[in-house]
């Protein structure tokens, strides 16, 4: 299990854009699972929506990508690299995510060749699917 500090040692995201609180399972290069505790204090709720707070769907997809990035970047040969979105396919939002929800995140790498890959992500709240998507990614080097 990885806590937020350990996650920050693997991926470069920081508040307010680190969207994973814990990683509970990792198979390096293959899959990862974790969660985000969604609180009323999230920055995005200030504008989405003030009187009816709902987590933006694109941030649910980003949280899935961050869990997947942990799986990829934990592999020794990928340490220190960055994972970038290359595309999103078959994305569906099934339920709203609201303050107080624990967003469970899982991403399985379907294929990875060279520096390009694809993964299948599923996000759930209370065992019910709230989002599914296929995410394409590219691993790159940090540019100075």
Curated annotation (Swiss-Prot):
Which InterPro entries does the entry mention?
FabA_FabZ, FabZ, HotDog_dom_sf
Disulfide-bonded cysteines? none
The record's section on Gene3D superfamilies has: Hotdog Thioesterase (3.10.129.10)
Q: What is its EC number?
A: 4.2.1.59
Q: Name one GO molecular function term.
A: (3R)-hydroxyacyl-[acyl-carrier-protein] dehydratase activity
What does the record give as the reaction this protein catalyses? a (3R)-hydroxyacyl-[ACP] = a (2E)-enoyl-[ACP] + H2O
Biological processes per GO annotation: fatty acid biosynthetic process; lipid A biosynthetic process
Q: Name one Pfam family in it.
A: FabA
* Protein keywords: Cytoplasm, Lipid A biosynthesis, Lipid biosynthesis, Lipid metabolism, Lyase
Active site (record annotation): 48
The record's GO CC annotations read: cytoplasm; membrane
The principal location of this protein is cytoplasm
- Record localization: Cytoplasm
Q: Which domain of life is it from?
A: Bacteria
* Family statement: Belongs to the thioester dehydratase family. FabZ subfamily.
Function, in words: Involved in unsaturated fatty acids biosynthesis. Catalyzes the dehydration of short chain beta-hydroxyacyl-ACPs and long chain saturated and unsaturated beta-hydroxyacyl-ACPs.
Q: What is this protein called?
A: 3-hydroxyacyl-[acyl-carrier-protein] dehydratase FabZ
What organism does the UniProt record list as the source? Bacillus licheniformis (strain ATCC 14580 / DSM 13 / JCM 2505 / CCUG 7422 / NBRC 12200 / NCIMB 9375 / NCTC 10341 / NRRL NRS-1264 / Gibson 46)
């Amino acid at each position: 299990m990885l806590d937020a500090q350990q996650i920050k040692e693997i991926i470069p995201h920081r508040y307010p854009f680190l969207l994973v609180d814990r990683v509970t399972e990792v198979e390096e290069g293959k899959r990862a699972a974790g969660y985000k505790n969604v609180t009323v204090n999230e920055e995005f709720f200030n504008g989405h929506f003030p009187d009816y707070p709902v987590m933006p769907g694109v941030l649910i997809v980003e949280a899935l990508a961050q869990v997947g990035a942990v799986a990829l970047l934990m592999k020794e040969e990928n340490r220190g690299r960055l994972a970038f979105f290359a595309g999103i396919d078959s994305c569906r939002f099934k339920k709203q995510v609201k303050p107080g929800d624990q967003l469970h995140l899982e991403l399985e790498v379907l294929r990875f060749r060279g520096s390009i890959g694809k993964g299948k992500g599923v996000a759930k709240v209370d065992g019910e699917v709230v989002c599914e998507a296929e995410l394409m990614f590219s691993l790159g080097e940090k540019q100075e």
